UniProtKB/Swiss-Prot annotation:
Pathway: Amino-acid biosynthesis; L-cysteine biosynthesis; L-cysteine from L-serine: step 1/2. Belongs to the transferase hexapeptide repeat family. The gene is cysE. Changing residue 110 to R: In strain: 60190. This is Serine acetyltransferase. It catalyses: L-serine + acetyl-CoA = O-acetyl-L-serine + CoA. Transmembrane segments: none annotated.
Length: 171
């Protein structure tokens, strides 16, 4: 929970509609979901799996954002207009990532083990995008709205389309 102040600052930097820390803390469901996730994740790491899942489901009911307590999330995640966001159990998210509403970071099978995506630092995932499977998304990647990503994306790339393909790559 030590990154709360950092998360609040990040929202203030990224969202021109955010006026102050109190507004963000009290009225942004993305922050509420992230706070519940941090507690649920701590419980999950201590093998209190049922309590962790119950807390994550309560957060989902309240915020419309589903984050599995087993996911690993770095500092400064900003979930903007988070309704319908799903973050699966083996998902890994780097620092300073932005996720818009309707995004799914999901698995592609029912097998055990790593089955959800890994996102690098400073990734932006547009509204409605689906990033599926045990794939790697590099640092500084932008994923367009409603894109479907099923394979690795290299650092600095931009991906768009229902069968997402790399259209740019920064050098």
């Amino acid at each position: 929970m030590l990154d709360l102040s950092y998360s609040l600052e990040r929202v203030l930097q990224e969202d021109p509609a955010a006026r102050n820390k109190w507004e963000v803390l009290l009225l942004y469901p993305g922050i509420h979901a992230l706070l519940c996730y941090r507690l649920a994740h701590a419980l999950h790491k201590r093998r209190f799996y049922f309590i962790a899942r119950a807390l994550s489901q309560l957060a989902r009911f309240i915020t419309g954002i589903e984050i599995h307590p087993g996911a690993k999330i770095g500092r400064g995640l900003f979930i903007d207009h988070g309704m319908g966001v799903v973050i699966g159990e083996t998902t890994e998210i780097g620092d300073d990532v932005t996720i818009y509403h309707g995004v799914t970071l999901g698995g592609t099978g029912k097998f055990k083990g790593k089955r959800h995506p890994t996102l690098g630092n400073r990734v932006v995932v547009g509204a409605g995008a689906k990033v599926l499977g045990a794939i790697c998304v590099g640092d500084d990647v932008k994923i367009g709205a409603n894109a479907v990503v099923l394979s690795d994306l290299p650092t600095g790339s931009t991906a768009v389309g229902s069968k997402a393909k790399t259209i740019t790559k920064d050098r």
